[in-house]
Regions:
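Nucleotidyltransferase catalytic core that binds NTPs
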Residues: 1-279
């Protein structure tokens, strides 16, 4: 039951957001404007019998940062995950519920048929891989300063998003994600948890990021080849990423070096990837 949908309705908790969910949102965005019905903390507890891993405000902030999400409404008034609150969005027309193949079931199809709503299933095969988001960021300068940040981003979280948001205020943000080989070299045998392509994909999905690349160098300055390519004006780090090698490189190459405090967005908890790996 696939029908024409220009406004895609997506309903989920989006608790502990991972790449597969982001891939789903990207594919939904190809169908139409993505309108997320985000489950409240109380609704998650009602449906699953447990509190969410991540609180509502943090889940909302993360979703708002994704370039594939157009609007979000927090909901708490459905009896089960196989229905939507009515009216869904009065001003949206035509509208349809978009689900992935694993979430498709007769109850959802019946609900949509009963209220005259479109319904579309995204096949699992469409969610495979981590597409590279091509853009003209390197060839077509915007007139703003270029800012580069580097890191592993092995478990992207709200703290990273806040860092990207702050840095993007300084200029066009380019993120260089550490290669698998270099992360392994710097952090040890159990790193990284996620592949370089998956980590780059998650970073490039953040709307504050103009472009994301994978490093091709080695050591703390593994992004040196990418810096030569991008030619940034500013190298930004947080307190944890402040290294003598980076300071020296910026002095030698005439880059402004900016160190930001490692602070979460107001009202959100401080997050660390090392802790989340065991969350």
């Amino acid at each position: 039951m696939n029908t024409v949908v220009r406004n895609a309705i997506v309903s989920d908790s989006f608790d502990d957001l991972r790449s597969k969910q982001v891939r789903f949102l990207e594919e939904a965005h190809k169908i139409g404007f993505v309108n997320v019905l985000l489950w409240s903390d109380a609704l998650i507890e009602s449906i699953t019998g447990r509190l969410p891993k991540f609180p509502q405000e943090e889940r909302l902030y993360y979703l708002q940062s994704l370039r594939y999400v157009d609007r979000i409404r927090v909901i708490s008034n459905i009896n089960d995950p196989h229905s939507l609150p009515l009216p869904v969005w009065d001003e949206l027309n035509p509208v349809g519920w978009v689900v992935d193949q694993a979430s498709d079931n007769p109850q959802k199809r019946l609900f949509c048929a009963s209220v005259g709503m479109g319904y579309q299933v995204i096949p699992e095969t469409d969610l495979l891989g981590f597409p590279f988001r091509r853009n003209d960021a390197l060839e077509a300068p915007s007139g703003r300063k270029k800012v580069i940040v580097t890191g592993c981003y092995d478990w992207l979280h709200s703290g990273h998003v806040r860092f990207f948001e702050e840095v993007a205020g300084l200029g066009d943000l380019f993120v260089v994600v550490g290669s698998d080989a270099n992360v392994h070299l710097l952090k040890g045998a159990s790193h990284p948890m996620f592949s370089q392509d998956e980590r780059r994909y998650m970073v490039q999905a953040i709307r504050f990021v103009r472009a994301a690349l994978i490093s091709t160098g080695k050591g703390w300055m593994d992004a040196e080849p990418e810096i030569e390519l991008i030619r940034p004006d500013i190298y930004a780090v947080n307190e944890d990423g402040d290294k003598p090698e980076k300071r020296r490189f910026c002095v030698e190459h005439g880059l402004e070096y900016v160190v930001l405090k490692r602070l979460p967005r107001a009202g959100l908890p401080r997050r660390e990837s090392a802790i989340l790996r065991g969350f």
